[in-house]
Amino acid sequence: MKKTISSVIMLVTVALIFCSCNNTGFNESRDITVISREEGSGTRASFVELFDIYSKTTSGKIYDATTDYADITQSSGVMLTSVSTNRYAIGYLSVNALNDSIRAVSIDGVEPTTDNIKNGDYKVARSFNIAVKDELSAVSKDFISYIKSSIGREIIEKSGYVAVLEGDEYVTKKLSGKITVNGSSSVSPIMETLAEEYMKLNSKVKIEINISDSSTGITSAINGNCDIGMSSRTINQSELNKGIKSIEIAKDGIAVIVNKYNTVKNLSSSAVNSIYRGDCLRWIDIK
């Protein structure tokens, strides 16, 4: 009799586990592995702002309330690898960095596509900005004119971003010199493409791009350690007060990503907020 009862219990347990996995190898009762970008990342700053993942101290100071249990990654590439190798992970990155190794979920029923970003339906969007000083070199000014031109706009659009600048037609001045660019790993892919195409028209110009994060890029521009700082977040007033100006060059979306085995197709903004605050711990608990 005891053996029979034990056998029944075992069969029920196996059946429950099988059902919870939804025949896909994904167990909804497992804990969510929260993955975030590092502090200083413009993508993290924009993500926290867009999903309102903030709290206040008793003195009223606002701070990033991302759970302390989140795993931290230093780049979009590491984020992709981390989520693609963990069935229960959730992360976020630039829409333009998406690939087939992971899956982007819809937010509030809207897919993260360039068209949805452009028409305003996808709300999880941010600006790509550059930080520069007024006293730029002639060659740096020329490169920015190129970015603003119809050529620059076309490159930005073809690369999957939303162009926002409208400048004059670009005519090369055949300048020479070096331009140093530093900052966001999210902005760097489009900046590298723009730089490559610009140098084809201006063979005596060398553009050197160093990838770090938004805060480092902005600080480098302020300190004169680079000509152009790249930022995937809004450049705040305290930074602008240090002698730089902000130029928006494109718009991009932030996609929330999960493992390909994950059965979740859509998340509400409030669910993402709860997950990243550490209030929602298991996939099965998502409301």
State where each predicted segment sits.
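C-terminal motif of bacterial Sec signal peptides marking the signal peptidase cleavage site
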Residues: 16-20
